Swiss-Prot record:
Gene3D superfamilies: Sodium:dicarboxylate symporter (1.10.3860.10). This is C4-dicarboxylate transport protein 1. Responsible for the transport of dicarboxylates such as succinate, fumarate, and malate from the periplasm across the membrane. It comes from the Bacteria. It holds the Pfam family SDF. One of its GO terms (molecular function) is fumarate transmembrane transporter activity. The keyword Membrane applies. The keyword Membrane applies. It comes from Ralstonia nicotianae (strain ATCC BAA-1114 / GMI1000). Keywords: Cell inner membrane, Cell membrane, Membrane, Symport, Transmembrane, Transmembrane helix, Transport. One of its GO terms (biological process) is L-aspartate transmembrane transport.
Length: 428
């Protein structure tokens, strides 16, 4: 029997977002007090992300029985991430030149108050590639889970799963136990997701109530350019990749619409991570590929963030009437490819990576970030939506490359069949 429309999760989340926007606009003081609802939901999701990643990755690797395969999947994933991320950076740069969102501002650099972005600049200077690599190694196993650091948990899971794989049948009992624990945590996620509309309402009401729709007006061109560019990236770049892999990007987006709406409401792509992993398995991707690709993509495959970074640099240079040479722009691209990974997992990562990138081009003052500080919150939704879509597509692509994509199940799900399907033999 079909559910009444008002009981469907994405309908509830969409309605909650609309109500949140209305409350924020008409009753801003009351709306600001709704912030704990959004924060609470995100905290509930973050509470289970670590255990889910650990159990899923360990179970997947232990089931491979071949560490060469683990390295092969990881290598293909990183190669894919780097190529697609570079496309995103270039598209952001080109779009900035085509639409010129910063032209006409004519801001005097001496009139900018840099105090508001000083903390981001300081963090950018203290963050290096070496620091990033060292921070992947946790001081203790417990510390990694206590902080909820995805990369640290992923490292522990890789080592633990590799050890179980090497032990073979002797470790089967442990592998089965961890697999059952994963099912328990996914069930917890289902329970938490029931309150997603409340979280989306609280987060959206706070955003509109605190910043107001009026604050967007002076920078609407930049916001519009960024959203349009992100849509073009998803439809064209990810669309072509999806078509070459054998599925439609539009049907894929429709398939993960609930996760996208949760991300839209909370501005946090992490809030949908557990559900995305489960959805990818139901789509026909193998558990081992899902466990490796999706968590890794949350640090190394940030397409929306990459578009934002290069476009923001161009916007600031145009607003300050600073001409960038071709060499400087190529340098920005090269540095952004590194900084976008080096600050993953850090609070305010988008601004920190932007500060680190600007620091390489002395002609653009880091203080110029003040110009977009006020609207960054409104652009974060688009970054998160693009990031999660890109990671979902990457998971399907890597599964296809590994010949571990169940195309029968993929075709059924993409055609609208959401019921249980009998797994067919995986095909390329």
């Amino acid at each position: 029997m079909k559910k009444p429309f008002y009981k469907i999760l994405y309908v509830q989340v969409l309605a909650a977002i609309v109500i949140g926007v209305l409350l924020g606009h008409f009753e801003p003081k009351l709306a600001v007090n709704m912030k704990p609802l959004g924060d609470g939901f995100i905290q509930l999701i973050k509470m289970v992300i670590g255990p889910i990643i650990f159990c899923t990755v360990v179970s997947g690797i232990a089931g491979m029985r071949d560490m060469k395969k683990v390295g092969r999947v990881g290598g293909k994933a990183l190669l894919y991430f780097e190529v697609v991320s570079t496309f995103a950076l270039v598209i952001g740069l080109v779009a900035g030149h085509i639409f010129n969102p910063g032209s006409g501002f004519n801001v005097d650099v001496n009139s900018i108050d840099a105090k508001a972005v000083a903390q981001y600049a300081a963090k950018a200077q203290s963050s290096s590639t070496v620091d990033f690599l060292l921070n992947i190694i946790p001081s203790t196993v417990v510390d990694a889970f206590a902080k909820g650091d995805i990369l640290q948990i992923l490292l522990i899971a890789l080592l633990f799963g590799g050890a179980l794989s090497a032990m073979g049948e002797r470790a089967q009992m442990v592998t089965d136990f961890i697999d059952q624990i994963a099912h328990v945590f996914f069930r917890i996620v289902h329970v938490i997701t029931r309150v997603a509309p409340i979280g989306a309402f609280g987060a959206m009401a706070f955003t509109i109530g605190k910043y107001g729709v009026v604050s967007l007006v002076p920078l609407l061109k930049l916001i519009g350019t960024f959203y349009l560019t992100a849509i073009i990236f998803v439809v064209v770049v990810l669309g072509i990749i999806a078509r070459l892999t054998g599925f439609s990007i539009f049907r894929f987006v429709a398939y993960i619409k609930e996760e996208l709406l949760i991300v839209l409401g909370t501005s946090s792509s992490e809030s949908a991570l557990p559900h995305l992993m489960e959805k990818m398995e139901k789509l026909g991707c193998s558990k081992s590929v899902v466990g490796l690709v999706v968590p890794t993509g949350y640090s190394f495959n940030l397409d929306g963030t990459n578009i934002y970074m290069t476009m923001a640099v161009i916007f600031i240079s145009q607003a300050l009437n600073i001409e960038l040479t071709l060499t400087q722009q190529l340098t920005i691209l090269a540095v952004a490819m590194l900084t976008s990974k080096g600050a993953s997992g850090i609070t305010g990562a988008g601004f920190i990576t932007l500060a680190a990138t600007l620091a390489v081009v002395p002609t653009i003052p880091v203080a110029g970030m003040v110009l977009i500080l006020g609207i960054d919150r409104f652009m974060s939704e688009c970054r998160a939506l693009t990031n999660i879509t890109g990671n979902g597509v990457a998971c399907v692509v890597i599964s296809a490359w590994e010949r571990e994509l169940d195309r029968t199940k993929l075709a059924r799900v993409m055609s609208g069949d959401r019921g249980e399907t009998v797994s067919a033999t995986p095909a390329a």
